[in-house]
Amino acid sequence: MKSGQAEIMETSKGIQKSGLMSRRIAILEFILRIVAFFNTIGSAILMGTTHETLPFFTQFIRFQAEYNDLPALTFFVVANAVVSGYLILSLTLAFVHIVKRKTQNTRILLIILDVAMLGLLTSGASSAAAIVYLAHNGNNKTNWFAICQQFNSFCERISGSLIGSFIAIVLLILLILLSAIALSRRH
């Protein structure tokens, strides 16, 4: 009789330990979603408010550089805004994962949506990175000149917004891995 009770006690301790680990993973997932949200919304705002005007010879002729002059940078802003909106909405499901234990269906849904948002964010950041590279280095074969010697503030801001977006990409990858780990621990 005592050995049966001992087995039950060990099993219940294992379940409690597994439940505690799942809760920790859910809390970490919640925190990573918040941090990723601030990175994506910060990148969208930083890029969306980027504007610099340079006088040329006289006060009447000016050159301007804005993010919406280039479609790739506009796509970057939209992609970051969409992903930040998704991350805010996904916080509700992440909170449910902290409170409840049986959340396999919502975890699968979050993995699918996280992968879709990762693809969107990666494509937006990659297209913007190509434009930022051209802004810094130019392309001699096509006679595209580097503009960052003239538009210092513009180039610093678009480069900074890329950093935030790439950090969010890494965080989304971690979120996908955490959700997969949490799912695998349940089976």
Swiss-Prot record:
GO cellular component terms listed in the entry, alphabetical order: Casparian strip; plasma membrane
Stretches assigned to coiled coil: none
Locations listed in the record: Cell membrane
Intervals, Cytoplasmic compartment: 1-24, 96-107, 183-187
GO molecular function: protein homodimerization activity
InterPro entries linked to this entry: CASP/CASPL (IPR006459), CASP_dom (IPR006702), CASPL (IPR044173)
Major localization listed first in the record, in broad terms: membrane
Gene Ontology biological process terms, A to Z: cell wall modification; cell-cell junction assembly
Keywords: Cell membrane, Cell wall biogenesis/degradation, Glycoprotein, Membrane, Transmembrane, Transmembrane helix
Residue ranges annotated as Extracellular topological domain: 46-74, 129-161
Glycosylated sites: 140
Transmembrane segments: 25-45, 75-95, 108-128, 162-182
Membrane-protein topology: Multi-pass membrane protein
Record note on quaternary structure: Homodimer and heterodimers with other CASP proteins. Interacts with CASP1, CASP3 and CASP4.
Physiological role: Regulates membrane-cell wall junctions and localized cell wall deposition. Required for establishment of the Casparian strip membrane domain (CSD) and the subsequent formation of Casparian strips, a cell wall modification of the root endodermis that determines an apoplastic barrier between the intraorganismal apoplasm and the extraorganismal apoplasm and prevents lateral diffusion.
PANTHER family: CASP-LIKE PROTEIN (PTHR36488:SF12), CASP-LIKE PROTEIN 1U1 (PTHR36488)
Family: Belongs to the Casparian strip membrane proteins (CASP) family.
Protein name: Casparian strip membrane protein 5
Source species: Arabidopsis thaliana
